[in-house]
UniProtKB/Swiss-Prot annotation:
Annotated source species: Mesocricetus auratus (Golden hamster)
Residues involved in L-glutamine binding: R49, L50, A51, V52, V53, N75, G76, E77, D97
Matching CDD domains: Asn_synthase_B_C, AsnB
Protein name: Asparagine synthetase [glutamine-hydrolyzing]
Keywords: Acetylation, Amino-acid biosynthesis, Asparagine biosynthesis, ATP-binding, Glutamine amidotransferase, Ligase, Nucleotide-binding, Phosphoprotein
Phosphothreonine sites (modified residues): T545
Record-level Gene Ontology MF annotations: asparagine synthase (glutamine-hydrolyzing) activity; ATP binding
Pathway note: Amino-acid biosynthesis; L-asparagine biosynthesis; L-asparagine from L-aspartate (L-Gln route): step 1/1
Site feature: Important for beta-aspartyl-AMP intermediate formation: E365
Sequence ranges assigned to domain Asparagine synthetase in this UniProt record: 213-536
Catalytic reaction annotation: L-aspartate + L-glutamine + ATP + H2O = L-asparagine + L-glutamate + AMP + diphosphate + H(+)
Binding sites annotated in the UniProt record for ATP: L256, I288, S363, G364
Length: 561
């Protein structure tokens, strides 16, 4: 995890513009660099480094002697870089995984390059010989990327929007900043004056398609067919591989553990993989919650079962409320459920940064969207409709859960790794017949639970524990986090303010006082940028007025049972 930033065709003083790049310094606390592009005085790169691999030669932009005309700034991890290096006999100058991008591009061009990358990434690649600029982002947008571009060809790119909003340009006083779409790459022409012109935007991968890099994967051969035992075996193989490949780091690895199915599977598998790799340190797991939190109790059971070195982080309602301003600033969104869920993750990341030397964190993000884990999937009218909704959620991860996971950890200089969003694992899961993936017997993620039932990775009570949203599980059922927040904002937003909400906020008008309160904070930090959130996250197929699972009939029934 790092912070990348670049300008092309700036007509303002670069030393002034570069101040904007310092707004993402939290993403790379170990080192930073600004570098002008040779022959283009109005083009430059900025890089904030979190040293995870190759501490000696890992600074960026990456340039190697063999390709003096190529400049690369990237944020991410390319897990198959060694396999590709060996397959094509590339001669590396560094041990940095991103160097593979330069070699692949020289060999086969940008499309083949990006399709061959197994990992999470956002990059800016400059080819001064052919006068081209390329931007690219991974399939699910696990690594963030934003851009601003004017009609006269000024281009600015950054890992977070906050690094672009204060940039100046003579023809456009208010730069439109927007997220770069996941699963896409863009080709731009570089003009002699340093400005650019977009040539094409290409969608290179659909989440259901097996990625091209699967041809060079180290995964053992999968069994054909959709018999249940065959599918379960294949899923176990792919999940183990997804965790194993993410061990790539020179820094200590830890794991977030809520006690829910997803993070518990990741933690247990991770501990197994670390032992097999003969890693010498014990796995640390971290859980957060208020007193009487069901997550703390469940996480404690998992930690005892797998034998991790477990840490519990307690917080109270006042600490959570006080963090809201920092959280919304870090998130760059005002989505209600995202803000709620981010507070706990922000606070536990802060604790890890302050109290440990670890920077690489594993987590269970992406599973709910992939495996139909949200409780409202019980109301899906058909398996086909559930499949459509699952794919929609995956496509929008970069606006919600992936955004939350990245910003709350990156705010404290940490790097998150998410095995459930592995290309091979997710594409295989989505290739299964729709009826195999729906909730069964009143239990969501039934297939995933069945898959690991005989693996001894988890206690049965955890494997079959009902879904609990992270923002709900950190507090007790009697005093839910969403209720604490709503009670607080009741005294911050009055009825008169709500009556004029549509006039004050005509786009994505908040319908609740909680939503109004978050929007106020967002507008304070990012005035006029409400379009970064296209819509609020809400459950489907039910008449929900609040995104919390604890407001749903299914949850209430389960809680009473």
């Amino acid at each position: 995890m790092c912070g990348i930033w670049a300008l092309f065709g700036s007509d303002d003083c670069l030393s002034v513009q570069c101040l904007s790049a310092m707004k993402i310094a939290h993403r790379g606390p170990d080192a930073f660099r600004f570098e002008n592009v040779n022959g283009y005085t109005n083009c430059c790169f900025g890089f904030h480094r979190l040293a995870v691999v190759d501490p000696l030669f890992g600074m960026q932009p990456i340039r190697v002697k063999k390709y003096p005309y190529l400049w690369l700034c990237y944020n991410g991890e390319i897990y198959n870089h060694k396999a590709l290096q060996q397959r094509f006999e590339f001669e590396y100058q560094t041990n940095v995984d991103g160097e593979i991008i330069l070699h692949l591009y020289d060999k086969g061009g940008i499309e083949q390059t990006i399709c061959m990358l197994d990992g999470v990434f956002a990059f800016i690649l400059l080819d001064t010989a052919n006068k081209k600029v390329f931007l690219g982002r991974d399939t699910y947008g696990v690594r963030p990327l934003f851009k601003a571009m004017t009609e006269d060809g000024f281009l600015a790119v950054c890992s977070e929007a906050k690094g672009l909003v204060s940039l100046k340009h003579s023809t456009t006083p208010f730069l439109k900043v927007e997220p770069f779409l996941p699963g896409h790459y863009e080709v731009l022409d570089l003009k002699p004056n340093g400005k650019v012109a977009s040539v094409e935007m290409v969608k290179y991968h659909h989440c259901r398609d097996e990625p091209l890099h699967a041809l060079y994967d180290s995964v053992e051969k999968l069994f054909p067919g959709f018999e249940l035992e065959t599918v379960k075996s294949n899923l176990r193989i792919l999940f183990d591989n997804a965790v194993r490949k993410r061990l790539m780091t020179d820094r200590r690895i830890v794991c977030l553990l809520s006690g829910g199915l997803d993070s518990s599977l990741v933690a247990s598998s991770l501990l197994k993989q670390l032992k097999e790799a003969q890693v010498q340190y014990p796995l640390q797991t971290f859980a957060i919650g208020m007193e009487d939190s069901p997550d703390l109790l469940a996480a404690r059971k998992v930690a005892n079962y797998i034998g991790s070195e477990h840490h519990e982080v307690l917080f109270n309602s006042e600490e959570g409320i006080q963090a809201l301003d920092e959280v919304i600033f870090s998130l760059e969104t005002y989505d209600i459920t995202t803000v709620r869920a981010s507070v706990g993750m922000y606070l536990i990341s802060k604790y890890i940064r302050k109290n440990t030397d670890s920077v690489v964190i594993f987590s269970g993000e992406g599973s709910d969207e992939l495996t139909q884990g949200y409780i409202y999937f019980h109301k899906a009218p058909s398996p086909e409709k559930a499949e459509e909704e699952s794919e929609r959620l995956l496509k929008e991860l970069y606006l919600f859960d992936v955004l939350r996971a990245d910003r709350t950890t990156a705010a404290h200089g940490l790097e998150l790794r998410v095995p459930f969003l592995d290309h091979r694992f997710s594409s295989y899961y989505l290739s299964l017949p729709p009826e195999m993936r729906v909730p069964k017997n009143g239990i969501e993620k039934h297939l995933l639970r069945e898959t690991f039932e005989d693996s001894n990775l988890l206690p049965k009570e955890i494997l079959w524990r009902p879904k609990e949203a992270f923002s709900d599980g950190i507090t007790s059922v009697k005093n839910s986090w969403f209720k604490i927040l709503q009670d607080y904002v009741e005294h911050q937003v009055d009825d008169a303010m709500m009556a004029t909400a549509a006039q004050k906020f005509p786009f994505n008008t908040p319908k609740t006082k909680e939503g109004y309160f978050y929007r106020q904070i967002f507008e304070h930090h990012y005035p006029g940028r409400a379009d970064w959130l296209t819509h609020y996250w809400m459950p489907k197929w039910i008449n929900a007025t609040d995104p919390s699972a604890r407001t749903l009939t299914h949850y209430k029934s389960a809680a009473k049972a």
